[in-house]
Amino acid sequence: MRGFGVHSEVGKLRTVMVCRPSLAHQRLTPANCHDLLFDDVLWVHEAQKDHFDFVLKMQERGVEVLELHDLLGQTLANQQARDFLLDRRITPNVLGSQIAEAMRPWLDEMPAAQLAAFMIGGIAISDLPEVRAKSLMLSALPETDFVIPPIPNTLFQRDPSCWIYGGVTCNPMFWPARRAETLIQRAIYKFHPIFLGGDFQIWWGDSDQPFANASMEGGDVMPIGNGTVLIGMGERTTYQAVGQVAQALFRSKAAKRVIGCLMPKSRAAMHLDTVFSFCDRDVVTLFAEVVDQVRCYSMYPKDDDGTFEIHPENRPMLDVVAEALDLPQLRTVETGGNSYQAEREQWDDGNNVVALEPGVVVAYDRNTYTNTLLRKAGIEVITIRGSELGRGRGGGHCMTCPIWRDPAY
């Protein structure tokens, strides 16, 4: 029987969601990749092979792997789900009245799997020969223009939603290029048979309202156990979102402490998990240059309505996290090599590992210095190739959205 809920960062991983490289990545070009938040184009065929290897290695350890294209295709077989998604994606405000009116009947009749591929991979004008003939606006635009842009960052399933203890958040993303990802997750959680009627709550974010300055991405969120949640506040996650999530968790008594981790804002350290991740119950890997600058603020529930009080932590982040887990201290594995090598390996996601169970992680093979230090610390490191998958700045932790994970303490 499948369960729902993520109760630690290193307990036995039972169910996870991923997204394979696909049409969205085939449409990345040197001209558009930066707008779509990729640093480079992928060799898609090799990225697909490497992602398949990643999935296989998780399955060999008993992890159930759910794939986003498959989930979305199955979801869109439900007419109510199809209407939910298209009513929000195919609108005059997004496309213009004439284009929206021309496209909607075409999409309504499309097979579910093809519609799922287009919702992730984008729709170019060249995909619309019949619709284009009916629209003066479309006929005037180049065939390579996108009516609906691709969303290649679906590769990094950690971010658009995140499971925190007995529920999930649907995250309003910082950059507009990623916001359609959250709508897809909302549709899946509402309508897919796996989740329909499931024993979980949606803590926050399942709304069509504008979130203004409140943004959050799952790479910043870690339910570490013992009723504690770490949330990084750097480039992508804002205090406006953190406060609302803390309030929702406290109101439901789902957590007893939320630790906000104020980080420097930089592309290299866009999320907390790019500089800090758990490998075992008491082992973390980290990029000290950034982690040493993190300032922590603990939030505790004050009343049953979810209001909370904030306590500044005037001590290092590692001490705060160890105390929250009732540990005397954390053992640390810093990014390996000299200062040049460490900076390179952090950029290549050397600290962005995903634990399959206590003491077992998946990491990119290219980060040889850091992987060696992890093994010396007693961690089993399962490697996958990272030369293509890492071009969007994300490793094993970024590419996985755990849905069911055991406690570790």
From Swiss-Prot:
The keyword Lipid metabolism does not apply. It is found in: Cytoplasm. Disulfide bonds: none annotated. Its main location: cytoplasm. It catalyses: L-arginine + H2O = L-citrulline + NH4(+). Its EC number is 3.5.3.6. InterPro entries: Arg_deiminase. GO terms for molecular function: arginine deiminase activity. Pathway: Amino-acid degradation; L-arginine degradation via ADI pathway; carbamoyl phosphate from L-arginine: step 1/2. GO terms for biological process: arginine catabolic process to ornithine; arginine deiminase pathway. GO terms for cellular component: cytoplasm. Keywords: Arginine metabolism, Cytoplasm, Hydrolase. It comes from the Bacteria. SUPFAM superfamilies: Pentein. The active site is at C398 (amidino-cysteine intermediate). NCBIfam families: arcA, PRK01388.1. Belongs to the arginine deiminase family. This is Arginine deiminase. It comes from Rhizobium etli (strain CIAT 652). The gene is arcA.
